[in-house]
């Protein structure tokens, strides 16, 4: 990235908040400037204006998409770091062709995903959606499958 004391870091849309307020942002200060936008860009034009001149883009989840059309307009871009396990918000083929590294966080939230899956399994086994709809309709019938039998 050439001069590592003058890197332009951009967070183009931290919505919902994931990066803003993190004490770890201070660790970037010795290396360059950080621009963080707390809302999502409304269109590609605004997205590109926010990312103009960026060498590093820190993307929160999949809120902001990086298609070939966008990546080709960012000649200085060298890295897209996503705060997610997936990379589906980035055109990986275009990034590779343009020599842009893409990093994600695989496995970082695995315990939470596993916990959520177990919760969903219980919800299906106990017909939680159906039971909720019945209660909201004012019907309080006999509960079936209450003990997972």
Q: What annotation goes with each model-predicted range?
A:
Residues 2-103:
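An N-terminal-biased, well-structured beta-alpha scaffold segment characteristic
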Residues 98, 106-149:
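Phosphate-binding beta-alpha-beta segment of Rossmann-like dinucleotide-binding domains, i.e.
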